[in-house]
Amino acid sequence: MKTLIGPKERLSSSLLWFTLLGSVAVSPALAQIRPMGVVPQATANQPKTAVPVTKTPTAKPPVPVTRTPKVGPDTLAPANPDFKADQPEAAQQAQVPAPLPPAMWDAGSAMELVAYIKQIGGDGLNPEDYDPEGLETAIQSGNVAAMSAAATERFDQVSSDLALGHVKKPARIDWYLTDKDLDSAKQDALLRGALARHDITAALNGLLPTHPQYAALKAALAATPPGDQARRDRIRLNMDRWRWLPRDLGEKYIIVNVPGFHATLVENGVNRWKQRAIAGKLSTPTPQLSATATGVILNPWWEVPKSIEHEAAGKKGFVPVKGADGSIQRWRQPPGPTNALGQIKFVMPNSKAIYLHDTNARSRFNSDTRALSHGCVRTEHIMDLATQLLGDDGGEWTPDKIQAALDSKKTVQANFVKPLPVYIVYFSDAALLDGRIVDYKDLYGRDPAAMAALKMKDGGASLAKPVDQVATPAKAKKAAAKPADQVATR
């Protein structure tokens, strides 16, 4: 059973990144941002050979068995509905090995950690959150045990924030992603390996995102004067959002940036396909999540969500689904030219029932502010995307076969040879190909809560509960009356 880290736990440094780019028209006056170099990676700690234990005549009390607590796959997101509370009891009660003795630090490594903390502002974090002065005092005391305890505590805090992000779940509004490659044992191995190699800096740098977007934001932060605190905070927040994401997005993946209203297919770090997208209205915001796309459905039925079934009930073109007692359970819309999903939708199961699909109102892609859906992502030219993916890896679905299926008017599912991940994210700052930063409108007002948590020492972990936000109709009406200025550029 896996336990994700808190301030005093340990975690892994498994890292790999790919490219997401902002896609908007920009002004010639935008400032250039130089690309950053490759971030060094931490090497894996070598396992030690087990030493046989010899029994002694003296009887010793039995070592108590520690059992893992019943926790979800992401303790940073306790409200994540993907968590299955009925996991097998045997897995929940797996025995945990006895902990290793505390890691012992030398003064040189501890001072290296102090120096690292003092420059961590370059990655958008606050050095004071890690109390470097307190560690310096412990070093000067000459007490190795006290110094080691203080250094380990700060190493855990820093490594946690670099790998997972400083902002915790209560301030991550509508956040449903998890990173499965984190546990305390791997963090402990990272620490002990760094001490053995006398290279704290490399171990911590290896936790940083290596994605070009992160490098561009870091360069923008360095180029922004201290007096422009609002801009610096916005950049810092979006750097932290990159730390929220898994390091390995996949060799090939789709990423949707909601504030930017665009979807991108990335393969081997290169943008292979990118188009405009329509996201959820203020009253039905699109959440941040990840899912695995296994294929597409051609000529799909639209299963009307319960939350909006009143819009379809009894109307022409909608079909009721009745239960055994004859009562109407839900409403469906059959395939056809008026179907809200258009000709195709992606099969990407997830707890929020969010997916990419076509639309029967393609002219809406020309709108400046494209917050128009019930939460799903309407994607421009999505048939082209599906055709590419269905033909990849020797797929049998040729363009002619796809067209024949569409012409049949029948509902058909076509599967990809290799499923691929889809990430729906929320970056209010992003970089263009040349490194210039684009400011997107904070569509759902998610920035303030996350910004406040970024400035808290505990990243908002002490907040009462997640503040997942659904705007009221009044707020939606008020926002709709504002000018459509969702994009500003630098």
Describe each PLM feature range.
Residues 34, 39-44, 51, 57-180:
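Cationic-aromatic interfacial patches
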